[in-house]
Structures are given as C-alpha cells and as structure tokens.
Amino acid sequence: MHYQNVRAAKFIDRPNRFIAHVELDGSVETVHVKNTGRCRELLVPGCTVYLEKGTNPNRKTAYDLIAVEKGSILINMDAQAPNKVFHEWAASGGFAPEVTAIRPEYAYGGSRLDFCLETPRGPHLVEVKGVTLEENGNALFPDAPTERGVRHIRELQRAAADGLDATLFFVIQIKNIASVAPNDATQPDFGSALRDAAAHGVRVLAYDCDVAPDCLTIRREVPVIL
C-alpha cells in the first residue's frame, strides 16, 4: 500500500490517544495519530515521524502520523495498514493461490473477523493483528492489553472446532524481524489463548514488511514463538 504527500517531522508530545504535536517546517502542528495504542516506546520526544497530508479540507487536522523512526528502524504505526496490506497480498495470491474471493468484516459467532477467504476447500477465516512492538530484533504482541484480541482468538478456535480453516495472521509493521511471540508480560491471557488455539487447529502465521515512509508491503514469513 502507498501513501501520498508524505512529510518528515519531529515529534514533540502526545496529549491524548488521538492527536500529537510535531514540529514541521519550524512550526508546531497538531496531527492525527493513526494508532490509539500507547506506543510509548515509539513516540519519544525528538524522534523523527512521518506524516501523510489529508485530502479532506474540512478535517480538524491536516496530517496523519503514520510512521516513526526508532533508532535506525523505521516502523509503520498506522493501525489501518495491516488489513489493507493483507487484503492486497491475499488478492495477489500471496496467502494462497486458490483464494477465489475475499470478504472483509465477516460475522462469525459473536464477533466480526477481519476476513473470510473463499477457497475450493470452503471458507477460511482470518483475523489480522498489526505488530509494532520491537525488542532486540524480535517482535511482541500486544503492546497493551486487548480483550478484543482474546475474543477473536476464541472465535477462531470455535471456527476450527466447527471444521473451518482459521488463521491468526500477524502483520509485523517492521522489516528484518527475527521472530514474534505473545507478550506474556503485558497480557498473559492473550498468550494462553493463542497457545490453546494453536493446539486446537488454529494456524498462527506472521510476516514482516518492507517499510518506507510512503509504502508498506508484506515481505516474508517470520517464526512465531509460542
């Protein structure tokens, strides 16, 4: 996926989940943050961030904050990007060449899962999780507790028990990641639910991405350490 009209800026602070203050062209600009997560390890005062200029002249902020430099690592932190890049990748045959249709926001059980992929074997349910937390070349998920994430895992496990193909798919919004693992220190029940689901038929996959300030593309499979 590609962004348009991307600018570099210097991060100042984040007064709430939705906006941040940055220095752009010598002036302080209020921008929309496209990730309501904590991102405390990413949004450090003085770091370089990347902004996409919005196209709606009536919006309150002119720019969206979409990526950040963490030392020498560029991390895409757009929470909407993982589903978009997965959809592009699956549509091009990356997930499975036999996919004949992609149905987003698929209602199953008491939840809406991100995708239902139609295949000759039948429906394949996929829940996508974007990963932005990096430690020593490895990735962890989640960066903050997510009860919704646990609920989605349990829905996938029910789907597998019903005989459907079901996959939890981590899109790591960082390049050259060695592995990804559940962040048990932050949310032990997410890791427990993921391990239980994997033991009962849910496939767990992870791919890292090629990341540029104006682009994000699924790259290669990364080991999942359960």
Which residues does each predicted region cover?
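Conserved catalytic cores of phosphodiester-cleaving nucleases, focusing on short active-site segments
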Residues: 9, 113-143, 156
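Short, charged beta-turn/beta-strand-edge "cap" motif at the junction between a beta-strand
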Residues: 13, 53-58, 172
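Short aromatic-glycine-enriched beta-strand elements
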Residues: 16-21
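Short nucleic-acid-contacting surface segments enriched for D/E, G, S/T with interspersed K/R
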Residues: 37-50
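Acidic-basic catalytic patches of nuclease active cores, encompassing PD-(D/E)XK
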Residues: 40, 72-104
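OB-fold/S1-family single-stranded nucleic acid-binding modules
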Residues: 56-73, 218-219
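Nucleic-acid nuclease catalytic cores
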Residues: 137-147, 154-186, 208
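Domain-level recognition of nuclease-like catalytic cores that cleave nucleotide substrates
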Residues: 173-226
